[in-house]
């Protein structure tokens, strides 16, 4: 048995530990096996910055019970839920997982099936009509399929179901009832589990430390904590220097959106003002946050189109006695796992190296992209 986890661990907290413990219990009750995780590194699916770098978060995941953590490349990390799920599942399927465990508000496989069957009957005309009315795809899916925008874990869970059904039907789903706060909740409440958002927003609140391990608290305090606002000056500079013509080449900038982005950047004085001023009914704040990251990292439409053929991925951390999994996967699958960059492998990661340097510029740390795999006893 090999259980997969798709995660951001931004940061890893008691709710994530609960999920990992559930996976460990299942493995122990079924004769043994491994937990393999694929994790976003520098930025997240909602267009947010990782609070600390990927190596710190991956090492924490291994200490919490994962056997290996593979880095999800930038272009999949900051993607729509379907593309995020598709690439993550491709990596995990090739890593030999038999099961995928995840937290969700609704654990009923029948619910996923019902939504999937509805989606098969939706015509392009229905989508186009709602797009003409100015709705974004998330809202359209909410209207047509009943997917609720305010339960992002369920939306991702459905994306996992859909992509596994299509590309890796041998993988069995292990949905676990999500406990505690919703993902988007920012305030600190008296709950067993806090949301990652609440922890990031209240990281200096002593109550928050109850939801983190001692190692994670030490690492966070030793690091420069990054927030989206830290990148505002670079984003604004990039928008103004690219101009409207240059913005057209950036991935996901379509339908004249470059004009709105450029005009709002000229007057915005902080990151949140920029996001709020660009977003509309058609363009959600999350979509705008992702686009701003693509502008920051100069991610073009060509970059995105080329990326999804990528078959080489980095391993950030692993248990010392499980490192042999890397060789097993490389010998038996269609992907290659790289524990350290060298002259032969660095060419596969040109875009991610650029992303890491932008992140490190604000984190004020060395080029952590070139660190070796972290092995933990």
Segments predicted by a language model, with ranges:
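Active-site cores that bind ATP or allylic diphosphates and position pyrophosphate for catalysis
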Residues: 71-377
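Short acidic/polar active-site loop segments enriched in Thr and Asp
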Residues: 33, 67, 98
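Class I S-adenosyl-L-methionine
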Residues: 24, 58-62, 162-165, 200
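A glycine-rich helix N-cap at a beta->alpha junction
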Residues: 59-73
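N-terminal catalytic cores of NTP/NDP-binding nucleotidyl/phosphoryl-transfer enzymes
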Residues: 1-57
């Amino acid at each position: 048995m090999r259980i997969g986890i798709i995660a951001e661990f931004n940061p890893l907290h008691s709710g994530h530990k609960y999920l990992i413990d559930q996976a460990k219990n299942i493995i122990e009750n079924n004769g043994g096996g491994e937990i393999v995780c694929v994790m976003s590194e520098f930025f997240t699916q909602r267009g947010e910055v990782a609070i600390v770098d990927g190596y710190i978060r991956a090492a924490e995941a291994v200490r919490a019970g994962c056997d290996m953590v593979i880095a999800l490349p930038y272009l999949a990390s900051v993607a729509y839920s379907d593309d995020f799920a598709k690439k993550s599942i491709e990596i995990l399927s090739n890593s030999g997982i038999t099961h995928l465990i995840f937290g969700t508000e609704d654990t009923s496989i029948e619910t996923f099936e019902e939504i999937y069957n509805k989606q098969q009957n939706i015509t392009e005309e229905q989508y186009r009509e709602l797009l003409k009315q100015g709705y974004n795809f998330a809202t359209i899916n909410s209207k047509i399929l009943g997917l609720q925008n305010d339960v992002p874990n369920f939306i991702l869970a459905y994306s996992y179901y859909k992509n596994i059904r299509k590309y890796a039907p041998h993988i069995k789903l292990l949905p676990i009832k999500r406990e505690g706060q919703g993902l988007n909740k920012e305030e600190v409440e008296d709950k067993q589990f806090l949301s990652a958002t609440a922890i990031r927003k209240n990281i200096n609140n002593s109550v928050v430390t109850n939801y983190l391990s001692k190692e994670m608290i030490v690492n966070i305090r030793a690091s420069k904590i990054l927030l989206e606002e830290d990148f505002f000056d670079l984003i604004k500079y990039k928008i103004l220097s690219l101009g409207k013509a240059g913005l057209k080449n950036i991935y996901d900038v379509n339908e004249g959106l470059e004009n709105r982005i450029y005009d709002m950047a000229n007057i915005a004085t902080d990151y949140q003002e920029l996001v709020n001023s660009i977003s509309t009914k058609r363009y959600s704040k999350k979509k705008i946050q992702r686009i701003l990251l693509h502008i920051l990292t100069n991610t073009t439409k060509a970059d995105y189109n080329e990326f999804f053929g990528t078959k080489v991925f980095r391993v950030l951390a692993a248990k010392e006695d499980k490192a042999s999994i890397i060789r097993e996967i490389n010998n038996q699958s269609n992907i290659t796992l790289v524990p350290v960059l060298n002259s032969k492998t660095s060419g596969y990661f040109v875009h991610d190296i650029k992303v890491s340097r932008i992140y490190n510029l604000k984190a004020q740390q060395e080029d952590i992209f070139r660190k070796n795999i972290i092995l933990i006893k």
